Swiss-Prot record:
Organism for this UniProt entry: Homo sapiens
Gene label: PIGBOS1
All ranges on the Mitochondrial intermembrane side of the membrane: 1-4
Subunit text: Homooligomer. Interacts (via C-terminus) with endoplasmic reticulum (ER) protein CLCC1; the interaction occurs at the mitochondria-associated ER membrane, a zone of contact between the ER and mitochondrial membranes, but does not appear to play a role in ER-mitochondria tethering and is not affected by ER stress.
Record's protein name: Protein PIGBOS1
Highest taxon of source: Eukaryota
């Protein structure tokens, strides 16, 4: 009466779900990485300018 999923079907659905999530949220991850890179560059510039003042 109750139909169960086989291990292969469950594994396929899991992989498909993870791949779909990565595809959907990829722009969010890219924007975060870009923001972090820009912030790191700004911090280096601030530190260099402070070192020059000293």
């Amino acid at each position: 009466m109750f139909r169960r999923l086989t291990f292969a079907q469950l594994l396929f659905a899991t992989v498909l779900g993870i791949a779909g999530g990565v595809y959907i949220f990829q722009p969010v991850f890219e924007q975060y990485a870009k923001d972090q890179k820009e912030l790191k560059e700004k911090m280096q510039l601030v530190q260099e300018s402070e070192e020059k003042k000293s």
